[in-house]
Amino acid sequence: MRMRYLATWATGLTLCAGLPLSQPALAVTVPAQNSPSAENHALLLQRLGHAHWVAQGKGPHVLYMIFDPNCPYCHVVFDELQPLIKPMGATVRYVPVGYLTESSLGKAAAMLEAKDPLAAIMKNEREFNMEHFGGLREILPSSATEKALEKNLAILRATGQSIVPTLIYRSRQGKTVVIRGGLDTRDMRSVLRDIAP
Protein backbone atom coordinates (compact mmCIF):
# COMPACT_ATOMS: atom_id res chain seq x y z
CA MET A 1 0.00 0.00 0.00
CA ARG A 2 1.23 3.49 -0.75
CA MET A 3 0.36 6.20 1.69
CA ARG A 4 1.00 9.88 1.29
CA TYR A 5 1.61 11.98 4.36
CA LEU A 6 1.18 15.61 5.12
CA ALA A 7 3.44 17.08 7.76
CA THR A 8 2.93 20.52 9.22
CA TRP A 9 5.11 22.93 11.09
CA ALA A 10 4.44 26.35 12.54
CA THR A 11 6.00 27.88 9.41
CA GLY A 12 3.39 26.41 7.12
CA LEU A 13 2.87 23.51 4.81
CA THR A 14 5.38 20.78 4.03
CA LEU A 15 4.51 17.79 1.89
CA CYS A 16 6.23 14.44 1.78
CA ALA A 17 4.82 12.14 -0.89
CA GLY A 18 5.05 8.49 -1.82
CA LEU A 19 6.27 6.97 1.42
CA PRO A 20 6.03 3.18 1.12
CA LEU A 21 4.70 1.47 4.21
CA SER A 22 4.63 -2.24 4.86
CA GLN A 23 1.31 -2.22 6.70
CA PRO A 24 -1.81 -3.39 4.88
CA ALA A 25 -4.39 -0.74 4.02
CA LEU A 26 -6.79 -1.91 6.71
CA ALA A 27 -4.34 -1.75 9.62
CA VAL A 28 -4.49 0.97 12.20
CA THR A 29 -1.36 2.97 11.54
CA VAL A 30 1.50 2.66 13.99
CA PRO A 31 0.61 4.80 17.00
CA ALA A 32 2.96 7.51 18.12
CA GLN A 33 4.07 7.87 21.71
CA ASN A 34 1.27 9.21 23.88
CA SER A 35 -1.28 8.16 21.25
CA PRO A 36 -4.59 6.64 22.32
CA SER A 37 -5.00 2.95 23.01
CA ALA A 38 -7.34 0.75 20.99
CA GLU A 39 -10.02 1.39 23.62
CA ASN A 40 -9.71 5.13 23.04
CA HIS A 41 -9.86 4.56 19.28
CA ALA A 42 -13.26 2.92 19.83
CA LEU A 43 -14.42 6.08 21.58
CA LEU A 44 -13.47 8.09 18.49
CA LEU A 45 -16.53 6.80 16.64
CA GLN A 46 -18.76 7.96 19.48
CA ARG A 47 -17.15 11.39 19.43
CA LEU A 48 -17.38 11.56 15.65
CA GLY A 49 -21.10 10.85 15.85
CA HIS A 50 -21.43 14.15 17.72
CA ALA A 51 -18.90 16.07 15.63
CA HIS A 52 -19.81 18.69 13.05
CA TRP A 53 -19.69 16.78 9.78
CA VAL A 54 -21.24 16.99 6.33
CA ALA A 55 -22.52 13.78 4.71
CA GLN A 56 -22.26 12.65 1.11
CA GLY A 57 -24.03 9.47 0.05
CA LYS A 58 -26.76 7.41 1.67
CA GLY A 59 -25.16 3.99 1.90
CA PRO A 60 -24.91 1.82 5.02
CA HIS A 61 -21.09 1.89 5.12
CA VAL A 62 -20.03 5.03 7.04
CA LEU A 63 -16.55 6.49 6.59
CA TYR A 64 -15.42 9.60 8.46
CA MET A 65 -12.84 11.78 6.73
CA ILE A 66 -11.17 14.48 8.82
CA PHE A 67 -9.75 17.03 6.39
CA ASP A 68 -8.44 20.57 6.04
CA PRO A 69 -9.84 22.66 3.14
CA ASN A 70 -6.28 23.56 2.05
CA CYS A 71 -4.82 20.04 2.22
CA PRO A 72 -3.61 18.72 -1.17
CA TYR A 73 -3.73 15.09 -0.03
CA CYS A 74 -7.25 15.55 1.32
CA HIS A 75 -8.15 16.83 -2.14
CA VAL A 76 -6.68 13.70 -3.75
CA VAL A 77 -8.61 11.41 -1.36
CA PHE A 78 -11.80 13.40 -2.00
CA ASP A 79 -11.37 12.89 -5.75
CA GLU A 80 -10.62 9.18 -5.29
CA LEU A 81 -13.81 8.74 -3.25
CA GLN A 82 -16.22 10.40 -5.68
CA PRO A 83 -16.70 7.55 -8.18
CA LEU A 84 -16.83 4.96 -5.38
CA ILE A 85 -19.39 6.38 -2.93
CA LYS A 86 -22.62 5.31 -4.65
CA PRO A 87 -21.56 1.97 -6.21
CA MET A 88 -19.94 0.80 -2.97
CA GLY A 89 -22.89 1.83 -0.77
CA ALA A 90 -20.92 4.37 1.25
CA THR A 91 -21.75 7.43 3.26
CA VAL A 92 -18.77 9.73 3.71
CA ARG A 93 -19.00 12.11 6.63
CA TYR A 94 -16.57 14.97 6.02
CA VAL A 95 -15.25 16.44 9.29
CA PRO A 96 -13.61 19.78 8.52
CA VAL A 97 -10.76 21.20 10.57
CA GLY A 98 -8.85 24.41 9.93
CA TYR A 99 -5.21 24.46 10.96
CA LEU A 100 -2.82 24.00 8.01
CA THR A 101 -2.69 27.55 6.66
CA GLU A 102 -3.90 31.01 7.64
CA SER A 103 -7.02 30.67 5.48
CA SER A 104 -7.91 27.11 6.57
CA LEU A 105 -10.10 28.07 9.53
CA GLY A 106 -12.09 30.60 7.49
CA LYS A 107 -12.63 28.12 4.65
CA ALA A 108 -13.71 25.37 7.07
CA ALA A 109 -16.11 27.87 8.65
CA ALA A 110 -17.48 28.79 5.20
CA MET A 111 -18.30 25.11 4.68
CA LEU A 112 -20.14 24.68 7.96
CA GLU A 113 -22.00 28.00 7.71
CA ALA A 114 -23.07 27.56 4.07
CA LYS A 115 -26.75 27.10 3.23
CA ASP A 116 -25.68 23.87 1.52
CA PRO A 117 -22.52 22.63 3.27
CA LEU A 118 -21.99 19.72 0.86
CA ALA A 119 -22.19 22.08 -2.13
CA ALA A 120 -19.60 24.29 -0.40
CA ILE A 121 -17.25 21.31 0.05
CA MET A 122 -17.76 20.34 -3.60
CA LYS A 123 -16.94 23.90 -4.72
CA ASN A 124 -13.83 23.95 -2.52
CA GLU A 125 -12.59 20.72 -4.11
CA ARG A 126 -13.68 21.52 -7.68
CA GLU A 127 -11.75 24.83 -7.57
CA PHE A 128 -8.76 23.47 -5.61
CA ASN A 129 -5.36 24.56 -6.97
CA MET A 130 -1.80 24.56 -5.68
CA GLU A 131 -1.60 28.37 -5.61
CA HIS A 132 -4.52 29.09 -3.28
CA PHE A 133 -5.39 25.52 -2.26
CA GLY A 134 -9.11 25.21 -1.42
CA GLY A 135 -11.48 27.07 -3.74
CA LEU A 136 -13.76 28.63 -1.12
CA ARG A 137 -13.35 32.14 0.15
CA GLU A 138 -12.65 32.28 3.83
CA ILE A 139 -15.10 33.92 6.21
CA LEU A 140 -14.85 35.11 9.78
CA PRO A 141 -16.38 32.22 11.73
CA SER A 142 -19.19 32.77 14.20
CA SER A 143 -18.33 31.82 17.78
CA ALA A 144 -20.52 28.70 17.46
CA THR A 145 -18.71 27.61 14.30
CA GLU A 146 -15.32 28.31 15.84
CA LYS A 147 -16.26 26.06 18.78
CA ALA A 148 -17.48 23.36 16.39
CA LEU A 149 -14.18 23.46 14.50
CA GLU A 150 -12.21 23.34 17.76
CA LYS A 151 -14.22 20.24 18.71
CA ASN A 152 -13.43 18.64 15.35
CA LEU A 153 -9.72 19.43 15.77
CA ALA A 154 -9.78 17.91 19.27
CA ILE A 155 -11.11 14.68 17.72
CA LEU A 156 -8.28 14.69 15.18
CA ARG A 157 -5.75 15.17 17.98
CA ALA A 158 -7.38 12.29 19.89
CA THR A 159 -6.22 9.95 17.11
CA GLY A 160 -2.68 10.51 18.39
CA GLN A 161 -1.38 12.56 15.46
CA SER A 162 -2.67 15.67 13.71
CA ILE A 163 -2.36 14.34 10.16
CA VAL A 164 -4.87 15.06 7.44
CA PRO A 165 -6.58 13.35 5.85
CA THR A 166 -7.48 10.91 8.60
CA LEU A 167 -10.05 8.24 7.76
CA ILE A 168 -11.95 6.47 10.54
CA TYR A 169 -14.52 3.68 10.34
CA ARG A 170 -15.82 0.54 12.07
CA SER A 171 -14.62 -2.61 10.31
CA ARG A 172 -16.65 -5.74 9.63
CA GLN A 173 -14.71 -7.30 12.52
CA GLY A 174 -16.09 -4.62 14.87
CA LYS A 175 -12.80 -2.75 15.26
CA THR A 176 -12.28 0.98 14.88
CA VAL A 177 -9.81 1.59 12.07
CA VAL A 178 -7.82 4.84 11.82
CA ILE A 179 -5.88 5.54 8.62
CA ARG A 180 -3.67 8.59 8.44
CA GLY A 181 -2.67 9.93 5.05
CA GLY A 182 -3.95 9.22 1.57
CA LEU A 183 -4.72 5.96 -0.22
CA ASP A 184 -4.65 5.08 -3.88
CA THR A 185 -7.94 4.05 -5.53
CA ARG A 186 -7.29 0.31 -5.17
CA ASP A 187 -6.67 0.67 -1.44
CA MET A 188 -9.72 2.94 -1.11
CA ARG A 189 -11.90 0.17 -2.57
CA SER A 190 -10.50 -2.24 0.03
CA VAL A 191 -11.29 0.21 2.81
CA LEU A 192 -14.86 0.73 1.62
CA ARG A 193 -15.37 -3.05 1.38
CA ASP A 194 -14.13 -3.44 4.97
CA ILE A 195 -16.59 -0.96 6.51
CA ALA A 196 -19.32 -2.60 8.56
CA PRO A 197 -22.90 -1.89 7.45
Located regions from the model:
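Thiol/selenol-based redox catalytic cores and closely related redox-interacting motifs
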Residues: 101-187
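Poly-acidic low-complexity segments
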Residues: 1-4, 68, 116, 129-131
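Extracytoplasmic thiol/disulfide redox context detector
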Residues: 2-104, 140-163, 183-197
